[in-house]
């Protein structure tokens, strides 16, 4: 069965899309730690990020860099942090999180509750900065 993230890429489940190329896809995390929290995934369905081939892992990181630079423009911050957990969804993903402090990277923090309009505005701001 396809992962929830493959179903997002296929358009079967809605998302707030940020960017896409032939191999990778970026969309907002639905339970964001901060505004601008974005996930980058390979379209290829692989659970563990370190099971990607060297070439695909390197290309995913380069794609994530483009998204991270756009997040930093759209949401001024000290730096955009990157994390990989993958304990919940078995489809490799990089979390990109604009940080004002180390505390913004604590996954145990309560998550933001945003309206659909707010998610849409955040995704368009990042897309526009790409
Ligand atoms: P983890 O696998 O531990 O890195 O966590 C999975 C992340 O995916 C969590 O931050 C979730 O909020 C996020 N997530 C799960 N389902 C969706 C979805 N349908 N759209 C956007 N983000 C999601």
For every predicted segment, state its role.
Residues 1-130:
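HIT superfamily nucleotide-processing domains
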């Amino acid at each position: 069965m396809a992962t929830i993230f493959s179903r997002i890429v296929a358009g079967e489940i809605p998302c707030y899309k940020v960017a896409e190329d032939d191999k990778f896809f970026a969309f907002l995390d639905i339970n964001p730690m901060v505004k601008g929290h974005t996930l980058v995934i390979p379209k290829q369905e692989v659970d563990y990020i370190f099971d990607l081939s060297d070439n695909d892992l390197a290309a995913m990181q380069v794609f994530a860099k483009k998204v991270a630079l756009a997040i930093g423009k759209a949401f001024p911050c000290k730096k955009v942090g990157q994390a990989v957990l993958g304990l919940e969804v078995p489809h490799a993903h990089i979390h990109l999180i604009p940080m004002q402090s180390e505390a913004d990277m604590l996954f145990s923090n309560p998550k933001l509750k945003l309206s659909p309009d707010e998610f849409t505005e955040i995704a368009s701001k990042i897309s526009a900065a790409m």
